[in-house]
């Protein structure tokens, strides 16, 4: 559960200032209804600029600017115990990355993306080697990331066999292997489904990887098991070539 993870990480709070992240204890809950206007942040001593509206700023970490989240009404009794995991995209002012919030929208933990491109996706808590961990996907360059309960990176890897990993799923199995999804375009005659003869089909691929070594333990291709005429999809109409005939969104074991 989220409570189990956050209990485990409490001892590592002092580590955060050294890792490019920010952490703080959540404030006491309040039943007050807040304004729907974007939060405003005051100028900070020693910081040569005033943070834009809608962006958090921290005295100890002026280099961090996660987007502020305004909660108009707290659902105190309707939500499960714990925190909210989100992965905001980079905005005009706020940074993109992985973020944990309380139910008032206060930042508990934030890890900005290390590059200027891409997005963090699919932030969640999982179990690895019997311990709670945070996992997410960084779309550029397509890396899968694991942090331990002290917010330290313990694994980072990519899809294997020359493929680029997809952001839809990263699941750690009960055997402590990684299950990931891939989309790969292969040449395909689409005349039977209303497309051109010389076109592409986007197939779904599943890989099971050894997290430590990156070795492929299992690989499954939709094109080997599901015929094109079984899809409900039609050839793409938005200027992209081919057909997205087998679209994997999640994995379950």
What are these regions (language model features)?
Residues 2-7:
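N-terminal export leaders
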Residues 9-12, 16-18, 27-253:
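Histidine-/acidic-rich catalytic cores in large beta-rich domains
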